[in-house]
A protein has these predicted regions:
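Short amphipathic alpha-helix that is part of the acyltransferase structural core
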Residues: 1-40
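A conserved beta-strand-loop-helix scaffold within acyl/acetyltransferase catalytic domains
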Residues: 27-78
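Conserved acetyl-CoA-binding loop-helix of GNAT-fold acetyltransferases
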Residues: 75, 79, 85-102, 121
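Conserved GNAT acetyl-CoA-binding A-motif
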Residues: 100-112
Length: 136
């Protein structure tokens, strides 16, 4: 929806704390870890995060949280509940992927299995699967 998109401001250098708050509002430990890691990586040019904002509030975010070996590992695509399904998040993801590709990075999106169809509709191709292991 063009009117919705025009009401939003894209920020390619949002405050790390605001992005962390949006992604992990109820998980302070995870939020603090994310904030610390993002600040450290961005200061060395190893990560980027973009947001869409309305009236100063983040309504959507996506990031490339590891830039290495010619690949940009994208993750944390998140849109506020009220605007999901309106194409806002998908458009931001595609814009960031295209910008990274124009700079010579190969965008790679890591996602949970239930989100594969969403990213395939955006033009991503499933290349493989990763497993995550946690120490118990």
């Amino acid at each position: 929806d063009a009117a919705l998109w025009q009401s939003l401001a894209k920020n390619t250098e949002p405050a790390a704390g605001k992005a962390a708050d949006m992604l992990f509002p109820d998980r302070p430990s995870k939020r603090d870890d994310f904030y610390s890691e993002l600040c450290s990586k961005r200061s060395r040019g190893l990560a980027r995060v973009w947001t869409l904002e309305r009236e100063g509030n983040i309504i959507c975010t996506v990031g490339a949280y590891a830039l290495a070996n010619g690949q940009a590992y994208m993750a944390c695509g998140e849109t506020v509940e009220a605007l999901r399904g309106k194409g806002v998040g998908g458009r931001l993801i595609v814009e960031m992927a295209n910008a990274l590709a124009a700079e010579g990075w190969m965008p790679v999106f890591l996602c949970s299995p239930e989100r594969v169809d969403f990213y395939t509709r955006l033009g991503f191709e499933k290349m493989g699967e990763y497993a995550r292991y946690e120490v118990q």
